[in-house]
Amino acid sequence: MATTTRATLRQRLSEEMGDYQSLTTTSDGNSAGTSVVDTGLRNLPGGADDDAFEGWYILATSGSNTGESRRIKSYIANTNTLVTQEAFSGGAVQSLVTYELHQHDPAQKHQAINRAIEELYPFLYLPIRDETIVVDDRLTEPAWRC
């Protein structure tokens, strides 16, 4: 049976909102863990303008900061650098780390996904009965009586 991961649900929700960018860093960020450097940002709408992504969110999807989300304080276009309001707990964001760029807080998207799951549970629930260890009912046969 196929399953859909939370990352896929978040991606689909974000795409429907017109709010999904998956990118990869191209250089190491600062040692304080408050910057992300990616030349791919220039290709996004407004990517050549300073502070184009101010107030957006970065969600790390690989590396030592996987799963952490930070709000963007500023964007410096000539260095392709996003500066976050709070440092990532895993330290500097290295090069070749994948991340998502969101206009809306990914945590709120996860809350929306959780609410949708709660609302849809009785209608989409598919019971699974594991019968891999069921053999037969020998205990109730009369031949086994003492």
Residue map of PLM features:
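Glycine-enriched, solvent-exposed interface loops adjoining structured elements
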Residues: M1-N30, G40-S69, S74-S89, Q94-C146
